[in-house]
Amino acid sequence: MEQLQATFDKLLRETSTTFHRYMYNRINWDARMIGLMGPRGVGKTTLVLQHIKEQLPRKDSLYVQAEDFYFASHRLTELADSFAKMGGKYLFIDEIHKYKDWARELKLIYDYHAELHVMFTGSSVLDIAKGAFDLSRRALMYEMQGLSYREYLELFHGIHFPVCTLEQLMQQEVNIPTGFLPLEHFADYLQRGYYPFSVGDIRMYIQQVVNATIETDIPQYADLTVSTARKLKRLLAIIAQSAPFKPNMSQIGGQLEVSRNNVADLCAYLEKAGLIGQLRTSTGGIQGLGKVDKIYLDNPTLIYTLAGKSVEIGTVRETFFFNQTRSFMPVTVSPISDFLIDGKYTFEVGGKKKKQNQLQNIENGYVVKDDIETGYGNIIPLWMFGMLY
């Protein structure tokens, strides 16, 4: 355990506390077991280390990575037992999906060590309610997104902007600080700002994240063969060159040499992993989601990384809107326009010259325009949807 402690100390020393992700103040840190899920590269590890560094006594805390060589000869339950006997109170386990029997052993730790507070992070691919060791009734779960435009401005440019609600956007109640130029950094955010990487070759780093997700995270979770993992990568390449598009599962299945049902499963894995977003129809009621109508890449930064020279600005705009809204509210395809939120608000997304033809006589219809700084009437600037968290 000495080496684990030494590694932990080194990571704490290297952790900056000058910027906090939106999730930092949303987590109930008093819960006995907390799970933080999210795509690779969005800052889960940094958030955990910041909390320990700022809020907890070092002697009561231990942070470990589930892939540490220590676990080649020790079980997670053994570590928890030893840590508890030493008076430990707060155990943090990073990238839990890399530990084979993670669900079973977390359940045992929860049941046998009431004195321990346990937090684990993992890939968004994981389903904690799956299998015999259901953690959903024990762990308080959170899902973390990549950077919003608001967070990007604070992290990389020192610009502070308050979080806005959808209602404020629709009612034109957003107060823009004096001197703030909302479009100055927006294009850069769309191209490279979703992931909190500040140095080096950003494009290469994102490609590494994508490769690790497809080649390691998803196959581990879904017990996929190497051949199927290759098909995942081919499917993502097809989506990157075509998104957004109405999926023809049979046609895609023919290209991948798998059944249409398998295509749907592969798309579900990519979506859970934070690589694509699937826009569905509504089948009665806000939560009644139907068939997939369109498939998008998850965020604009992925478009610029994976689509190469075939980047369409209209696709970037729609992807940004869908990405920034769907994690906090139900978003479905609109029968008359682009998007329907909460089953009642219709949004048409476009450029500065976008007309309102499709929204004439539509109650709760809004036009979302790129390249404008302020809104009026039912027109909302696109950048403002980056202020929701």
List each model region and its residues.
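N-terminal pre-Walker A segment at the start of P-loop NTPase domains
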Residues: 1-26
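Interdomain motor-coupling "hinge/lid" segment immediately C-terminal to the ATP-binding subdomain
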Residues: 2-10, 123, 130-236
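Hydrophobic anchor at the beta1->P-loop junction of P-loop NTPases
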Residues: 36
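Conserved lysine of the Walker
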Residues: 44-45
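Short glycine-rich substrate-engagement loop in P-loop NTPases that contacts/grips substrate
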Residues: 58-90
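Structural recognition of the conserved hydrophobic beta-strand(s) that form the central parallel beta-sheet
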Residues: 92, 117-123
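Accessory nucleic acid-recognition modules appended to NTPase machines
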Residues: 194-337
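Conserved catalytic cores of phosphodiester-cleaving nucleases, focusing on short active-site segments
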Residues: 321, 325, 339-353
